[in-house]
Amino acid sequence: MKQLFATTSRGFEELLKVELTDLGAQECRVVQGGVHFIANDETQYRILLWSRLSSRILLPLITTKIYSDLDLYSAIVGQNWLTHFDERVTFLVDFNGTNREIRHTQFGAMRVKDGIVDYFERHGKTRPNVDKEYPDIRIHAYLNQDELVVSLDLSGEALHLRGYREDTGKAPLRETLAAAIVLRSSWEKGTPLVDPMCGSGTLLIEAAQMEAQIAPQLHRLHWGFDFWKGHNQVVWEKVKQEAVELAEQAFNRKLTPHFWGFDLDHRVLKKAQKNAQNAGVSHLIKWQQGDVAGLKNPTEQEIGTVICNPPYGERLGTTPALIALYSVFGRQLKTEFADWNVSIFSGEPALLDCLRLRAYRQFKAKNGPLDCVQKNYHIAVRKQVESAVENSQEKTLTFVSENTQVAQDFANRLRKNIKKIDKWANQQKLDAYRLYDADLPEYNLAVDRYADHIIVQEYAAPKNVDENKARQRLLDAVSAILSVTGIETNKLILKVRQKQKGTSQYEKLANKGEYFYVHEYGAKLWVNLTDYLDTGLFLDHRLTRKMLGEMAVGKDFLNLFAYTGSATVHAALGLAKSTTTVDMSNTYLNWAEQNLLLNDIEGKQHKLIQADCLQWLNKCDRQFDLIFVDPPTFSNSKRMEDSWDVQRDHIKLMANLKRILRTNGTIVFSNNKRGFKMDIDGLQELELSAVEISAKTLPLDFERNKQIHNCWIIRHQS
């Protein structure tokens, strides 16, 4: 009998213990990351061949305390390696763990390697070679604080590598994880199993191999014991032959196919079919291209299990689509799979609540670095389902957080706002406006409509707010927005807005290059909803731009810190004599040019200038009748000579603007600094007068956010 250790993913240790016991292991003892057990040769080989949950099977050779690299080397060089393999074989050392002296795993692996080759030299043998790709012998060393365990890896390559997967779709499950998911589900052999989002088919293939009694490693060609001197070839051949005969018997029984795999992507289905063929279970699984929204029960009056690992996104941009996917999936489960069991594995537990199903059991697990959960459900019988569907029409929403009343309040507020603001916007001939702006403190976000698109901007939560609760609230909000607006998920865009530093408001978020135009008081303006934090149009300045258009008739107009030139468009459409548009960003200046062309505004009288606005202003010798200046609150761009602070520097700016302002000219000055205070005394010294018009420039959709900007009319004193 040998002392052995089976490694597995965290969370599966107890499940592995049951499997090992069923395979004949004795004295099983669970520890974190695996199970210790004893076994004779026959059981050892049977476990290697049949274990669906083990990552590796290790034979411990050395267990000792080490306090230095010399202790490590001495422990290795003192081991009788010739009893395990000779000098002609290649080997590789896997080293995991550190302590105060062995601080790097590469150093630990090197010292183990040195000890092994030096042992052979001391015994008059040649040094065995290291092979990092295909070693004959694999040595596994694990250091936990000061305790070292050195083992012979009998598996060779990790046991999750079954050999049947030639190609996969995105984010494939490891075979060992897939097997654990199947074993933890409520599926019973001989009953139907359906995977509606099967990807490369790993869940179904693992289950089908269980049904067909196919050993997961039946077709493995290379093992970690092939060149081990302790290998018992006779016993191994016996165990392997038993596995071959079991698989043949199952095949000859002509099992009825009752595994179904669906996926929207026909390309990944082809990979799944090939994988199933390699695994010897292609005759048991039926594959079909299909969307979850059209999912139908493929069986006839049979009761079975739905098993699935739906997509889950770490990036927030995928959230609207995922909420819709899980909601639709839950609906189809209730209408098509009454009295069935369902087992869902997900890395986003909050999304599972969108199924609107009550789990009777759940398990925690890891998928690589991700914390995941598997939940088991039972679908109510059909009469209960029909009643539930009748009572859950359009106004009933799927919410994630526990406080569903607050979530319903958000939905009601949004519905009320839409009724009021949509009517107003239609009268004003607008199709870009705000629907919601942190009206409820629990839902600190903005919702903007851009034609047939919706942008949700979540303001960054304070550090004292629990991240999970904030995430749940966001899921609730998106779910409500999808339901209340009826918008398609691919037209809902989600962004997280944080406090800006320097020029970070100009940083790119994506590179989709998707532009379309919106209408604003007769102007057409290009917007881009995905590539930048801002869209190219500041909605709160809509009335300011309208006012500039009305003031611009026959005047020379200057737009400083122009952004995408939307104010210039209004001035030009208002029959300005000339326009000059200045911005430091070449990207936004090109955008401004496209805005002008979109409105058929052309000619030498419309100038676009790429420059540092403050430096350009210092050198400008032209005179203007109407100047619009909307500077950033703060900027320390490397392309600017000095930093800029609107509170600190606005009087200096006004002094320069006065110089180029004609006698009867007007400056429209605006900024977004909350608490901004105009230096009236400083203006008087410059012989300028100022009148605040902030309230007049605040449109209906921003009337609750009175501090979003401040706006001033500044003229020469008469």
Curated annotation (Swiss-Prot):
<dbReference type="InterPro" id="IPR053943">
    <property type="entry name" value="RlmKL-like_Mtase_CS"/>
</dbReference>
<dbReference type="InterPro" id="IPR054170">
    <property type="entry name" value="RlmL_1st"/>
</dbReference>
<keyword id="KW-0489">Methyltransferase</keyword>
<dbReference type="Pfam" id="PF01170">
    <property type="entry name" value="UPF0020"/>
</dbReference>
<keyword id="KW-0808">Transferase</keyword>
<dbReference type="InterPro" id="IPR029063">
    <property type="entry name" value="SAM-dependent_MTases_sf"/>
</dbReference>
<dbReference type="GO" id="GO:0070043">
    <property type="term" value="F:rRNA (guanine-N7-)-methyltransferase activity"/>
</dbReference>
<dbReference type="Pfam" id="PF02926">
    <property type="entry name" value="THUMP"/>
</dbReference>
<dbReference type="InterPro" id="IPR002052">
    <property type="entry name" value="DNA_methylase_N6_adenine_CS"/>
</dbReference>
<dbReference type="Pfam" id="PF10672">
    <property type="entry name" value="Methyltrans_SAM"/>
</dbReference>
<comment type="function">
    <text>Specifically methylates the guanine in position 2445 (m2G2445) and the guanine in position 2069 (m7G2069) of 23S rRNA.</text>
</comment>
<keyword id="KW-0963">Cytoplasm</keyword>
<keyword id="KW-0694">RNA-binding</keyword>
<comment type="similarity">
    <text>Belongs to the methyltransferase superfamily. RlmKL family.</text>
</comment>
<dbReference type="InterPro" id="IPR000241">
    <property type="entry name" value="RlmKL-like_Mtase"/>
</dbReference>
<dbReference type="InterPro" id="IPR017244">
    <property type="entry name" value="23SrRNA_methyltr_KL"/>
</dbReference>
<dbReference type="GO" id="GO:0005737">
    <property type="term" value="C:cytoplasm"/>
</dbReference>
<dbReference type="Pfam" id="PF22020">
    <property type="entry name" value="RlmL_1st"/>
</dbReference>
<keyword id="KW-0698">rRNA processing</keyword>
<dbReference type="InterPro" id="IPR019614">
    <property type="entry name" value="SAM-dep_methyl-trfase"/>
</dbReference>
<dbReference type="InterPro" id="IPR004114">
    <property type="entry name" value="THUMP_dom"/>
</dbReference>
<dbReference type="GO" id="GO:0003723">
    <property type="term" value="F:RNA binding"/>
</dbReference>
<protein>
    <recommendedName>
        <fullName>Ribosomal RNA large subunit methyltransferase K/L</fullName>
        <ecNumber>2.1.1.173</ecNumber>
        <ecNumber>2.1.1.264</ecNumber>
    </recommendedName>
</protein>
<feature type="domain" description="THUMP">
    <location>
        <begin position="43"/>
        <end position="154"/>
    </location>
</feature>
<dbReference type="GO" id="GO:0052915">
    <property type="term" value="F:23S rRNA (guanine(2445)-N(2))-methyltransferase activity"/>
</dbReference>
<keyword id="KW-0949">S-adenosyl-L-methionine</keyword>
